[in-house]
């Protein structure tokens, strides 16, 4: 069985790749270059994780997105929320809008679908999850359902996108990742990269962007030692 894993190198996609590995899929991983500030770090993480999982890794260039994106992920204007803001819907929604890349997931998953059909893979594994689905509309079960409906008409082999984490929050994702590492006797999570910035050192996180804040909280609430190095703890 073949599968494509959309692998940004972050915690969610790293754990999703472990899920695919645990289900005995022959994995091909894809990382997208959409002109994001953290691109080099994301690629390094994705390459390392792919190597550990014995997966072919491809970087796909969709850098044209940068031409019309005003996202902080492209411009470097990254919001730095307070810890108590993470569960405040209005503040989280404001942060979401600041980093929203126009139609990013739609573009990436559409290309991944073509890749999957081309290599006769039956599934696309994505790291969409419940916590990010609160504010990001393209992380919701509704998005997954409707995207898969379009694949019924847009692909001949009826490839399907799956999101094994869509019912989980970040602490549950961290916990699942640790369980899968032990089950598969692999070490992946410490090589994942969640930060919105490139901090000039491999796997070094800023510790202040929303993604870093959620990562910190995930390990703490899961009761798991955080293997991440942060500029600001």
UniProtKB/Swiss-Prot annotation:
Gene3D superfamilies: HUPs
Sample GO molecular function, one term: zinc ion binding
The keyword Lyase belongs to this UniProt entry's keyword annotation: no
CDD domains, alphabetized: QueC-like
Entry annotated with the keyword Zinc: yes
Coiled-coil intervals: none
Pfam families per the UniProt record, alphabetical: QueC
Catalytic reactions on record: 7-carboxy-7-deazaguanine + NH4(+) + ATP = 7-cyano-7-deazaguanine + ADP + phosphate + H2O + H(+)
Cofactor note: Binds 1 zinc ion per subunit.
Family matches, as InterPro entries: QueC, Rossmann-like_a/b/a_fold
Binding site for ATP: 7-17
Keywords: ATP-binding, Ligase, Metal-binding, Nucleotide-binding, Zinc
Enzyme Commission code: 6.3.4.20
Cofactor annotation: Zn(2+)
Annotated Zn(2+) binding sites: 195, 206, 209, 212
Pathway: Purine metabolism; 7-cyano-7-deazaguanine biosynthesis
Extent of the signal sequence: none
Function as written in the Swiss-Prot or TrEMBL entry: Catalyzes the ATP-dependent conversion of 7-carboxy-7-deazaguanine (CDG) to 7-cyano-7-deazaguanine (preQ(0)).
Stated name of the protein: 7-cyano-7-deazaguanine synthase
Native source organism of the sequence: Methanococcus maripaludis (strain C5 / ATCC BAA-1333)
Lineage: Archaea, Methanobacteriati, Methanobacteriota, Methanomada group, Methanococci
